[in-house]
Amino acid sequence: MRNWLLPEYIEDVLPAEAARVEQLRRSLLDLFKVHGYLYVIPPMMEYMESLTTGIGHDLDIATFKVVDQLTGKLMGIRADITPQTARIDAHMLNNQGVTRLCYAGSVLRTSPDGLARSREPLHVGAELYGHAGVESDIEIQRLMIKALHTVGLDTLYIDVSHVGIFASLLEHAGIGEAQEQELYAALQSKDQAAVRALGRGLNPDTLEALSSLTELSGDISVLEQAAKRLPQTEKIQQALRDLKAVGAGLDDLDVKVCFDLAELRGYHYHSGIVFAAYAQGYAGPLARGGRYDEVGAIFGRARPATGFSLDLRGVVSSLPVAETVGAIFAPAIADDALIFVVESLRAQGQVVIQDLPGQEPYRAELGCDRILVQQNGEWVVVAAPEL
């Protein structure tokens, strides 16, 4: 085995891309800060009980597991930061009102995930705890849209659904977990024939409603159709009212909102509105999120919660190559005036690379497009000839 090889779907981030990732990470955290979201840095590793309990089987499978050499207990390397922020809100901060948290950190997954098909995505996200109303769902989605605009994505499509509709339809259906999973899979693939076949033993009205979910997709007008075709229960009608409020709450933004009532991503994890952001020319969701009101229960407090996250490395790898800004080359001369100019330029945010003895043959590798030269006794910056 060659010592420089990395595991599959694990890779280095080289200087140009790393600089862009870090610049955007800072910009996103600054965006979250001015919206009142407090930055937290959860640990890379925790006991498995806190990382995956209450989140569902999928996250357990995605988590790398190790044995703690100090205690002998099973630990996991985080595959998702959301459960960690839920723990911080419920157990560490213990606020009674609304808490807004944000984060930016790498996660490790057993299988590749996200736009870049990486097992080590860089998750950046925001979570809002302590408010159950649709207003907080709207706030989080608006923040997600601003975040994607910040990284340079303009033409956005927001796909919105509500897992509570499917859950409400099955609430009194009396079906087993296996049949529920099969219905879920059929709806995800919009296979209406499979839905009807799987639901033969259900109440005819329930089956008709489940089948209609595969057709209820489109702009905000589809919610009016849904209100007529779905049962007139308070839970379902309230879910539709909440979705309509989301459409109105995003109406002033330059995005296209689509409602897809068969979209049930995270059904066993989310408890209400779910959403994902797409952009023209990009395969797969750029960011996703939703409401997950029960996750904090395992930590002692089941607080209302909603949030979103994006894989910043994946997003950056999909963006057009950025134009690089060259550095300024400074000769290796012991001159107080030169040192003063170099430090002044650096204080302004300019990149100045001071030459070192013996490096003349390699100056072209520095990427400098300007050079400090002495003219009339003063050091000035001019366009660099071939170094």
From Swiss-Prot:
Heteromultimer composed of HisG and HisZ subunits. PANTHER family: HISTIDINE--TRNA LIGASE (PTHR11476:SF7), HISTIDYL-TRNA SYNTHETASE (PTHR11476). One of its GO terms (biological process) is L-histidine biosynthetic process. Pfam families: tRNA-synt_His (PF13393). The keyword Ligase does not apply. This function is generally fulfilled by the C-terminal part of HisG, which is missing in some bacteria such as this one. InterPro entries: aa-tRNA-synth_II/BPL/LPL, HisRS-like_core, HisRS/HisZ, HisZ. The gene is hisZ. The lineage of its organism: Bacteria, Pseudomonadati, Pseudomonadota, Betaproteobacteria, Nitrosomonadales. It is found in: Cytoplasm. GO terms for cellular component: cytoplasm. Belongs to the class-II aminoacyl-tRNA synthetase family. HisZ subfamily. HAMAP family: HisZ (MF_00125). This is ATP phosphoribosyltransferase regulatory subunit. Transmembrane segments: none annotated. Keywords: Amino-acid biosynthesis, Cytoplasm, Histidine biosynthesis. Pathway: Amino-acid biosynthesis; L-histidine biosynthesis; L-histidine from 5-phospho-alpha-D-ribose 1-diphosphate: step 1/9. It comes from the Bacteria. Required for the first step of histidine biosynthesis. May allow the feedback regulation of ATP phosphoribosyltransferase activity by histidine. It comes from Methylobacillus flagellatus (strain ATCC 51484 / DSM 6875 / VKM B-1610 / KT).
